[in-house]
Curated annotation (Swiss-Prot):
Organism this protein belongs to: Laribacter hongkongensis (strain HLHK9)
Family, per entry: Belongs to the EF-Ts family.
Listed InterPro entries: EF-Ts_dimer_sf, Transl_elong_EFTs/EF1B, Transl_elong_EFTs/EF1B_dimer, Transl_elong_Ts_CS, UBA-like_sf
Coiled coil segments of this chain: none
Alphabetical list of CDD domains matching this protein: UBA_EF-Ts
One MF term in the entry's GO annotations: translation elongation factor activity
Name of one Pfam family that matches: EF_TS
Major localization listed first in the record, in broad terms: cytoplasm
GO-annotated cellular components: cytoplasm
The name this protein goes by in its record: Elongation factor Ts
Subcellular location: Cytoplasm
Entries under PROSITE patterns matching the protein: EF_TS_1 (PS01126), EF_TS_2 (PS01127)
Function: Associates with the EF-Tu.GDP complex and induces the exchange of GDP to GTP. It remains bound to the aminoacyl-tRNA.EF-Tu.GTP complex up to the GTP hydrolysis stage on the ribosome.
Region (Involved in Mg(2+) ion dislocation from EF-Tu): 82-85
Amino acid sequence: MAEITAKMVADLRAATGLGMMECKKALVESEGDMAKAEEILRIKSGAKAGKLAGRVAAEGAVAVFSSADGKKGALVEVNCETDFVAKDAGFLAFAKLVAEAAANSDAADVEALSAVATAEGTVEEVRKKLIAKLGENISVRRFQRFVTAGQLAAYLHGTKIGVLVDLNGAEALGRDIAMHIAASKPVCVSKEQVPAELLETERRVYTEQAAQSGKPADIVAKMVEGRINKYLAEVTLLGQPFVKNPDQTVEKLLAENKASVNGFAMFVVGEGIEKKKEDYAAEVAAAAAAAKG
């Protein structure tokens, strides 16, 4: 039997918003499996999915670059340690430099991107100079490059959320779609692209919830399909109500404009990274103990 720690209970409580005892029981039932415990709680409470991996904690910036003709571009996330550095002009310039380097190279991963030459030196050389200047660890976390026969459109919400859309259609429409993605955060373009494991988890949760209603099997099956269809509309770009006109879905908006979306990328700064929490009381105690020694 896995040991259930107070931190595990606290993390599950933060992710689900449910009571401490409920979370502890779910962890015991799942033998310490956090994802399984969250699923157990969703089944019992009817709660929506809350993903621990989605907790935003790290600092940094998202930057985007798109060529003048809108045929190639890149979205990047660069991380640092503090919000102060995240707002530094030199740090933000570095993020933009990395985005341009990613768009103009064939780098397949961050390691390869580090060796790409820029007007100021390689990405890695510029990064090290910036670390020496600002006194913080700075890292290129991820990037996504697009090359299209269509049109690229971008949207940045400050420096914390960035979207790059590949579409067949006007750039102005693309910017609206990119802004919608930043606001509504779809998982993918269409229901056919929803990951099978994600859909299976939702179906399992809905089935368990519907079964608890005590209704006949055929009614339960219809309830489950109804919930699945609603879920698909919520997480797919095409199924979502357009943020600037909720009476119209994005799919209908695109059809009216004879346009289509080939793909998109959305980065949220720090998504999936949990920042280390400083325990200053412990640091003082440790320093005092060291002084006595």
